[in-house]
Structure formats: C-alpha cells, structure tokens
C-alpha cells in the first residue's frame, strides 16, 4: 500500500522538524499498513524553494535512517507543487512520485483559475500526469468537480460499490481509457494565464486525504470529502501527514477498513501501464532511491 503524500522529510517545509520526528511518523505509517511512502515537501516560490536534487538526497538519507531503525518502509521522492503564477519556473525540472509519471500538485487557497489550469497544462505537456491533492479542501477544485457532476462517470467509468467489488482492475481500466484520449489543446504562448473558462486537461487525477474522512480538518471538509467520494472523483488515498502527533487522528484504521471505497483507493499503485516512467539516473544519483 502506497501513501502518495507526506511531509515526512525533516526540516524542508512545514512537516517533520527533526529526524526523530520523521522516524516517529514512519513508524505510524508502517503500523497503519503502508509499505511505500512518497516524500512530498511543498514547492512554493518564496517559501520552500526546493530542487529535485535536494529532495532526492534528503530521501536517501531518511531511507538510511529508517533502515538502521528497522522501519520497513520504501521511500519515494516527490514534491507537492503549488499551482500559482510562479509554477512555470519549476516546470522545466519536475520531480514525479518515485518511478511513476504522477506529479503531485495543489491549488492555492485563493486560486486564480487561469494559473491553475495553465499549471495543469504544463504538467501534461511535460509528459506527466497531474495528481491533485485533497480537492475536498480546495474551493476551486471542489466547485469544479461539483460543476462537472459525475466526474469519472462522464468518462464512462463505473465507480459504484458493486463495480468496485466485482472488478479489482477498475482503476487500471480508468487509466487505460484516460490515456486513449486525444491530446488537449496547447496552452497559450504568452505569459498571461489561460482564460478561466478553459477546460482543465482530462488526464488529471485526484487523491483524497484520509484525515478528511476522519474529521481531522473539520466537518465541512468531511462533508466535502464524502460528496466527492460519491461522485467517484478520487483515484487514490493519502495521509498528507505533517507530524507524528496527528497520526492518531489521521490514521484511523476502523474508518479505513470499513469503507470499501477508501480500501479500493488505497490499492491504487500509480504504476499501471502508460503511467510508468523510465528512470535515467545521472552520476551521483543512486538507483536504490527508487
């Protein structure tokens, strides 16, 4: 089971502060059942100006610490990119999640629709697949999904409980259909954002935060999460864990075990056909990182 979104790397953003904090978080994630964890610090211009190489190196170091502690977790490097007016500065050197083509991203609290859409277009143009974090917590994405109605239903995918129970390959089927789509229209070439009425690329996936279903972010987000879940908007599930002390509230085993939708999303591995990425490492990078 893979956690696609954590802030487990120490002293890089608003997540873990020390290595001890990171190890405590890792132990909680392993106890919950995760076997692989994506290390995804924020990438925000002027706040967290991180480079892919910094994240790779930090991931390697923490992996060594976990191995020494006997914590059975596979760490994948990644970033959580902010889709704002500065995102284009990072788009030339994007860091996907491990050996997938998934690029984790989020919208600002006061999102400019044009910049968000332009950011999604840039990710797709670079050959990656946007994985949007916690749309239930973001007004822009929540309202867009509601406006579109049955999100995945519009693409001909059956996300009803019966279908999920009968077919354990429904997610892979979704991905195959998704990538058979024709290429979207290219973004504008000037430095202005796309017009707010432009449609986002169809090759956009969404992950839910497990804590959204447990009430960690409050009742409004909890309602939003269940509403999007009913619409079939989500492809994957993540903890978005920032600190060890919140693990008890976020990683609620009963909530996870008793909900077939959440269970199914947790089985998504992000390495289905057409998502795999050929990893080419230069000198100084280690294959063991992946």
Language-model-detected regions and their locations in the chain:
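C-terminal regulatory/interaction regions
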Residues: 173, 177-182, 246-249, 275-290
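Hydrophobic faces of well-ordered beta-strands that scaffold small-molecule active sites
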Residues: 2-6, 37-39, 75-79, 103-105, ...
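Short acidic/histidine-rich active-site segments
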Residues: 233-249
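An N-terminally biased module of ancient metal coordination in phosphate/nucleic-acid-related enzymes
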Residues: 1-70, 172, 289
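Extended substrate/RNA-proximal surfaces in nucleic-acid metabolism proteins
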Residues: 49-148, 158-163, 170-183, 191-199, ...
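His/Asp/Glu-enriched short active-site or ligand-binding loop at hydrolase and phosphoryl-transfer sites
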Residues: 205-215
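Mid-to-C-terminal alpha-helical segments outside catalytic/metal-binding sites
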Residues: 254-290
